[in-house]
From Swiss-Prot:
Keywords: Coiled coil, Golgi apparatus, Membrane, Transmembrane, Transmembrane helix. This is Golgin subfamily A member 5. GO terms for cellular component: Golgi apparatus; Golgi cisterna; Golgi membrane. Involved in maintaining Golgi structure. Stimulates the formation of Golgi stacks and ribbons. Involved in intra-Golgi retrograde transport. It is a single-pass type IV membrane protein. Residues 134-148 have a biased composition (Basic and acidic residues).
Length: 722
């Protein structure tokens, strides 16, 4: 509110000028002219500022309305006190016109308006002038009238604005909406009113009694202006009321929006629940449809079985009639046939018993072979471990012998070096002795004889030492030869041990190679088993895909049924039909659950079979690490036992085979054997099985395409009549 403080400061300055002009108006005319010029200038500035304030008030009205309600409670008491002081001040200013300066100062103090006080000499001069002679009063009466009129004209816009502000303040106070403190208008209004009253009192003091009429006119104008301000305050109150109403409407709209949002959320929740119910019903319908399809398929199968059984029943009835006829024709043939059949039955039972015994024997042989193979494998493993231990010991011994050989070689070299050193030393000693002997021989006289005896003694000693050294040399040579012989023995022993170790290593390598081959064969068998498992998985995946395709088709049908249900619900939805449908869907769901349980049990059984096969494969890997030929023979024997266990339709050992019956029996047995061999082949080679499955699938697909796309030709020619 800087503009308002500026406006208040200017109004204060203006009122100070008015007071000073009123005090000095009676003294000089030049001063009055100066006051009038300043008043007119300041009034123009005041009007411009008032326009700017009106614009600002129009712009800040919206913010003022929102902030006024918050400051009502805090400023209401201060406003009431200020307005009370204002009213008392105005009344006292009107009653005491002679003491206007004192009343003005009291009004300024009550309204908390700080203004410079008028100097006491000016007031004294004013009173002296008023109490002066009549001539001066009469001579200056015209001038004072003009000056008071000009002053009143100058003060009039200010008093109008002040009265408007005061009336606005009073109306807002009566309405209980203290809006003026929000804008800071209370103090300037009081100031302006007090100053206008002071100005009017000053004019009254200057003019005296004849100006009472003008004062009444001014009061009327002031009353009119107050009425206008009151109307403006009423408009402001109405605007505030409208703003409150709009705020209440806004709150109501917000509550409505919250209610609408809650209703929308409830509707969305109910829609989701209904969708979930529809989905559950559709799933139940799909389950019911799938159960109906299964029931239809079972019904068709039952019809086919019924037809086949009726056909077999008819054929049996025909055979029965024929048998009865044959029995009536000759019971002897029947008895013979019965005896032959009994004999064949006995033979079949005996062959069955023999096959069972042979199968048991084969199983026992297989168990014994497996035990032998395991024992051999354990023995071989122990032998390999012992051979490795022996090899390590021989290696360690050879290392020790090599170290001994190295030490002996080093000792021999040292002995050779010592022998050479000793030989050199002996040769040097002998040379020195010979030189000494020669020198002694060359001597003469007595000294020669003494020296000769001494030299002979020394020579004998030297010879004795030489003999000793020769003996030592011979001993050392014997030791050297003995060490050489030991070294040769060690080398020969090491070579023989190395050869034996090589032979053992070769044996171990051969055994390892055989085990590797057996391992590779078992790995190949494992790969075949894995391929079979993969084929089974692929079959399961294909069945899963087909079932998913069926599920999609059922979902499409469910969507159609949903549309039909929605149409029915729109037309007429009966509760009984829905309950019946729900009951049917629950039944289909129960059937589907039973089917799923059956499928899960089948899956578990397949998984158990697969685990059993893997366990058997691991056992085969563990048992046949070293005997592949034995395992193959066992497998062949198992296949032979399987061939023997397969029931043969007709035995070839019947001697009484003749005619068409014998040929048919041979053909049936050959077909049976071929089918058995084909089954064994397919069981052994899963790739061939896959190719056959693909071929059959393509063949059936081609047949279906031909049946569905074939259109028979329509011959419109008339028959020839033949």
């Amino acid at each position: 509110m800087s503009w308002f403080t500026d406006l208040a400061g200017r109004a204060e300055d203006f009122l100070n000028l008015v007071d000073q002009g009123a005090a000095t108006a009676l003294k000089t005319k030049d001063g009055n002219d100066l006051i009038m010029d300043s008043i007119t200038d300041y009034s123009g500035n005041f009007e411009e500022k008032q326009k700017t304030t009106e614009k600002y008030q129009s712009q800040a009205k919206s913010s003022f309305i929102s902030s006024a309600a918050d400051n009502i409670k805090h400023q209401k008491a201060t406003m009431l006190a200020g307005t009370a002081n204002i009213k008392t001040g105005t009344r006292s200013s009107i009653e005491s016109s002679h003491n206007s300066s004192v009343n003005v100062s009291s009004h300024r103090s009550t309204t908390q308006f700080v203004r410079q006080k008028k100097s006491e000499p000016d007031d004294e001069q004013l009173f002296d002038f008023l109490n002066s002679s009549d001539k001066v009063h009469s001579s200056s009466q015209k001038e004072t009238r003009k000056e008071s009129a000009s002053v009143n004209q100058a003060v009039k816009p200010i008093s109008q604005s002040v009265t408007m502000a005061e009336d606005f303040h009073n109306t807002t106070e009566d309405a209980g909406v203290p809006l003026l403190p929000e804008l800071g208008i209370t103090e300037p209004v009081v100031k302006a009113e007090t100053l206008s009253d002071s100005g009017s009192s000053a004019s009254l003091s200057t003019t005296g009694d004849p100006k009472s009429h003008e004062l009444s006119n001014l009061r009327l104008e002031n009353q009119l202006l107050r009425n206008e301000v009151q109307s403006l305050n009423q408009e402001m109150a109405s605007l505030i009321q409208r703003s409150k109403e709009t705020q209440e409407e806004l709150n109501e709209a917000r509550t409505r929006m919250e209610k609408w949002n809650g209703d929308n959320s409830k509707n969305d929740r109910t829609a989701r629940e209904l969708r979930a119910q529809v989905d559950d019903l559709s799933e139940a319908m799909a389950a019911k449809d799938s159960q109906l399809a299964v029931l239809k398929v079972r019904l068709q199968e039952a019809d086919q079985l019924l037809k086949s059984r009726t056909e077999t029943l008819e054929s049996l009835q025909i055979e029965k009639s024929r048998i009865l006829q044959d029995q009536s024709e000759g019971s002897s043939i029947h008895n013979q046939a019965l005896q032959t059949m009994q004999e064949r039955l006995r033979e079949a039972e005996s062959t069955l018993i023999r096959e069972q015994e042979s199968y048991k024997q084969i199983q026992n042989e297989f168990a014994t072979r497996l035990s032998k193979i395991e024992a051999e494998r354990q023995n071989l493993a122990e032998a390999v471990i012992l051979a490795e231990k022996k090899h390590m010991e021989e290696k360690r011994k050879s290392d020790d012998l090599q170290q001994q050989l190295k030490t002996s070689k080093v000792g021999l070299d040292s002995l050779k070096q010592e022998m050479a050193d000793y030989k050199q030393k002996a040769t040097r000693i002998l040379q020195s002795k010979e030189k000494l002997i020669n020198s002694l021989k060359e001597g003469s006289g007595i000294e020669g004889l003494d020296s000769h005896s001494a030299s002979t003694m020394e020579l004998e000693e030297m010879r004795h030492e030489r003999d000793m050294q020769r003996e030592e040399i011979q001993k050392l040579m014997g030791q050297i030869q003995q060490l050489k012989a030991e070294l040769q023995d060690v080398e020969t022993q090491q070579v023989s041990e190395a050869e034996s170790a090589r032979e053992q290593l070769q044996d171990v390598h051969e055994q390892f190679a055989t085990q590797q081959r057996a391992k590779q064969e078992l790995e190949a068998e494992l790969e075949r088993q894995k391929q079979e498992f993969q084929y089974i998985q692929e079959d399961l995946y294909k069945t899963k895909n087909t079932l998913q395709g069926r599920i999609r088709d059922r979902e499409d049908e469910i969507q159609k049924l949903r549309n039909q249900l929605t149409n029915k619900a729109l037309s007429s939805s009966s509760q009984t039909e829905l309950e019946n449908r729900l009951h049917q869907l629950t039944e289909t769901l129960i059937q589907k659950q039973t089917m799923l349980e059956n499928l899960s049990t089948e899956k578990n059984s397949l998984v158990y079979q697969l685990e059993r096969l893997e366990h058997q494969l691991k056992n085969v890997q563990g048992s046949s690490l070293n005997g592949t030929s034995i395992n193959m023979s066992v497998i062949e024997s198992n296949e032979g036992a399987r061939m023997r266990n397969v029931p043969v339709l007709f035995s070839d050992s019947d001697p009484n085979v003749a005619g068409m019956y014998g040929r048919v029996r041979k053909a049936a047995t050959s077909i049976d054997q071929f089918s058995i061999r084909l089954g064994i082949f397919l069981r052994r080679y899963p790739i061939a099985r896959v190719f056959i499955i693909i071929y059959m699938a393509l063949l059936h697909l081609w047949v279906m395409i031909v049946l569905l796309t074939y259109t028979p030709e329509m011959h419109h020619d008339t028959p020839s009549g033949k």
